[in-house]
Amino acid sequence: QHTLSVTRLCEYYCKAYPLLKKDLLITAAICHDIGKTKEISLFPENDYTDDGQFLGHIVIGVEMVGEKIRQIPGFPAVLANELKHCILAHHGEYEFGSPKKPAIMEAVALNFADNTDAKLQTFTEIMENTTETGWLGFNRLFDSNLKGTRME
């Protein structure tokens, strides 16, 4: 669900900001978390793999995408680097596990879409798990005291 939501946000960004390379951004959105398929083991184990512990999903994902790119004859080197950069930079900041900060417009857009979906989905889950309105208390992810609101 997260990857689909990120991709939809990126589609919107492409309409709102025509300078974005749509093919690059949509491909990056689809591939940005592909490394999680090797970072975490399957159910019922559902725990970090050795590769997941050592490398993390971002590095694993760049390696997976790089392997596929090498199988495509004549794939443009600049485009390959741009796609890999988007994946490497999708967490946006070093302190959030990003090996690189976004350096191209598509990487910025992907970071915003990923962050927006993660935070709004988390807030949605908080709201779905409470019947309270008013102040809900401090939340570390948001670094803020959250307030529950409902449609009247």
Predicted regions mapped to residue ranges:
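C-terminal functional modules
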Residues: 131-133
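C-terminal membrane module of polytopic membrane proteins
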Residues: 117, 135-138, 146
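N-terminal intrinsically disordered, cationic/polar leader segments
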Residues: 111, 128, 137-140, 151-152
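Divalent metal-dependent catalytic cores for phosphoryl transfer on phosphate-bearing substrates
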Residues: 12-129
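All-alpha helical catalytic cores of prenyl diphosphate-utilizing isoprenoid enzymes
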Residues: 1-8, 34
